[in-house]
Amino acid sequence: MLLAAGLAAGLAACGAPGGDGGQAANPQAVPDKPSKPVELNILDVAGNLQLTKQMIENFKAAHPEVLSKVTYSTAPAPSMAGKLKAEQDGGVAQTHLVLSGTDGLSAGIANGTLAKVLPDFAGRFPNLMQNYQEPAAKMQELTNGYGVEVVYYPSGPLLEFNPGKVPAAPASPQELLDWAKAHPEKFQYAQPSNSGPGRTFLMGLPYLLGDKDPKDPDKGWDKTWAFLQELGKYVKYYPSGTTETMKNLASGSVDMIMSTTGWDINPRKLGTVPNTVKTAIMQPMHWVTDAQYALIPKGLSPDQESAILQLIAWMLKPDQQAIAYDDGYFYPGPAVKDVTLQMAPQKSQDTIRQFGRPEYEQWIAQYPKETSLPAEQQVKAFDKWNQLVGGSKVGKK
């Protein structure tokens, strides 16, 4: 999607140019409350607003003295770091808050466009790490202080399939490869750098295959790269985003795709995918946890930073976190402890009752949870996938 044009450039012009080495404004220079209500331009590169927009709107309604207006825009994750760099090089910070997955986080850290939030502003988030669920706290550590986790889920990797065409789901990577060979062009996953299910599959395979070092895509993934190259012989193309794989599953152009808990539940709720599809796990199963973050670009004014820090702290309150159950998009969703489905809006409770799968609770409790790759390693993994596996077949039907 194209970015919304003309994002309150007048207000944003008060932001200073970047180039401070990633440091946020001096914490002492950022007031507890802005001197006057601010306007914020929020860029979502992760589909995160589906989970958090109501939290943000609730904050705006409760704190008109902090926030006067919010403008939302969306963009693909791979475009985020370049957009922020162009703004900061031009001395005009038009984007004030980014909602991103680990992909945008990794790219933003790599190109130096994000402000350091922690430990600089730890005082604005009392007991942050203790309040997170344990696997969510590990996902927060991946930020290196350049963001604050707002939602979390165990993710996958899951196989999602049409049971009419796949009577018995593959129970291991070898069985998946055998199935793909026997049914060429009927299995698919999306480009990992722009797809939660795609990168969860990529990062989960080293555990499934018993690779040498699951945290080192460069030197420890020999089995994974060989497997993906072999599997790729039977994949027609790699869509540039997850939604296309869902539509292809629904239309019958493919019969099996990679998925996650949220990408299974939410498209069935929306009707994108028929409610008859099934999911399965491969063994030895390891969840690869996923999260989405609030990222603050460099070059903002102290008032803007003040408002954003208050907003993020608000989003981490348990009553706001309960909104993250949403329609199962990031199931379960809450990053902080002790936020139950019973605390969620009735609509969310109804959705999970109708479209959730009882086995997910059992699987989440039963199998080990591994964090996504750290930022630098994730960028390496995406680059290597583009070179070795699928770069020439992305989006080309």
Residues covered by each model-derived region:
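A bilobed periplasmic-binding-protein/Venus flytrap-type ligand-binding module shared by bacterial periplasmic
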Residues: 158-165, 206-208, 291-304, 323-327
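Early extracytoplasmic/lumenal segment of secretory-pathway proteins
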Residues: 27-106
